[in-house]
Every structure is written in C-alpha cells, then in structure tokens.
Amino acid sequence: GWAIGSAGGILCLLLVLPAIVMVKGTDLPVRGAFVFTAIFFFISALPTFLWIKERGEHKPLPDGKNYLSLAFSRLGRTVRSVQHFREFLKFIVAFLIFNDGIVMALDFAAIIGAVLYGMNQTQLIILMILVQFASVFGAYLSGIYGERVGFMRALIVSLVLMIGAVVWMLFNQTLVGFFIIASLAGFALTGVQAVTRTMTGVFAPKGQSAEFYSFFAIAGKTSSFIGPTVYGLLATGVALRLEAGGMEVLLAEQIGQRAGILSIAVFLVVGLVILLSVSEQRARKAALDYAPAD
C-alpha cells in the first residue's frame, strides 16, 4: 500500500512538472499545482469511499453511553493497562526518536543539496523524482522482506541503511554522490515508515487496532518538531559562530549543514539502539494474551 501511494505521488508530480518547469516569470503554476494535487487526491480516494466496505460488524452502544463517553472510557482502560504493553511502549519511544531523524532528512534534503552542492531548482526536482522512485521499491521490498524474515528485522535493516546513507553524506563531496545517497535514503526511509505502521498493527490486541494506531500517529505528530528544531539550531549556531570568527560565509554554512547532518545520524542511532531492546515475540504475546476488562 505504501509503495502504491509513493507511485501515485510520482504520477502526480510528473503531471504538474511540465507547467512548473516551462512557465517562467510567475508562481501561478506552483499555486495551480496545489489545486491539482488536491483534485488528484480526491479522485484517487473515491474508490475507497465508494467501494471498500467495513469488515467489522456494527455493535450497539452500551446502556448509558454515547460515542464520546465510550471513547474516553476505552482510552482510560488502555492507559490503565499500559504496563501490559511494555514492549510496545519501548517500540514507541524508539519510533519517536528515529522518526525525528527521518523527518529531519526529509525537511532539510533540499537545503542540504542547495548549500553543500549548489543545486538549482531543476536539479532539486530531479532529486525529488529519484527519491520518490527509490521509495516505491523501498516500501515494496521491505514489506516482502518483513513477511519472510520478520518485520522487526526488516525495520532494523532499513534503519541501518538509512544511517549508512547519512554517514556517507557527512563525507561526500560530489553532486553525483549526493544523488546516490538521496536515492539510498529514499529507499530506506519508506521501508522504515511502512514497517513501523505494520508493526503497530501486529502489536495491537484484537479489536484495539484503531486505539494503537491513533496513539502511534499522535505520538509521531507531537514529537516531530524536536528533530528539525535541533537541526536548525545546530546548523545555524555553528555557521554563525564560524562566521563571527572570520570564516567565509558559504564555507561556514556548509560546515553548519554537516553539523546538522551529524545530528540526524545521532537520532537514528539512538532510536535503533532502543529498538534493539524490543522483543517482537513478547510484544506479540502481550497482544494475544490481553483481555480488557470493560
């Protein structure tokens, strides 16, 4: 599913790209691309809304309950049972940390390309297309690999590849090398994103997938500002200090960006270390053994 979504993103980009590249002197094509993307998304979502049916059976509300009170009571039940899901909690902590590394890489890829390698708009667009193509294969192959050898192992491999790409970028000096690194990162990061969501479903008890996915989504959204903030403060702080010491502005900015890249690696490595302490077997057992008391 993640691979198909990435492929759809490539198709949308290719459809709007000619107008953005060919029409000069105005930002109208860029503004129009947002409208086109919204329409593209709406049309693509229609089959889901119209033809996919819920498998679950409708359950009547308990006496004296409405949907809001029932939601809060079940949330309280899940919070009270948190000790039962220690492996899932460790998994979420690991996710919060390495996901910030992923967000940092996505948010600053274009800036890194422009500052370190002098990439122009056309080159950045080509870079994004390459990353998207790589992400299709990364999501698809990580899913197959996870089905065969285990999703935890697939996630670890994807994170190791991502860390390798970031470390390589620390020392890379060529534009061609950056294109290769970005493609490897695109391949790895979609594997991370796809497999983490799959593992959330695997770790969720029967009938509580929505609660666990909601917790997973909220945790990721509420923490995702930390990594980019660290990157921005570090890159800017290092650059300003070097400029104050008399270093040429561009060189100072480049060193600042490499300091930021190092922080990406730190987030990914720390997240991986915590992930290695998670027992997939115990997490699955906890989900199977859980019997909620309504």
Where in the sequence are the language-model features?
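Helix-loop junctions at membrane interfaces in 12-TM secondary transporters
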Residues: 170-181
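Structural signature of the two symmetry-related core transmembrane helices
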Residues: 153-168
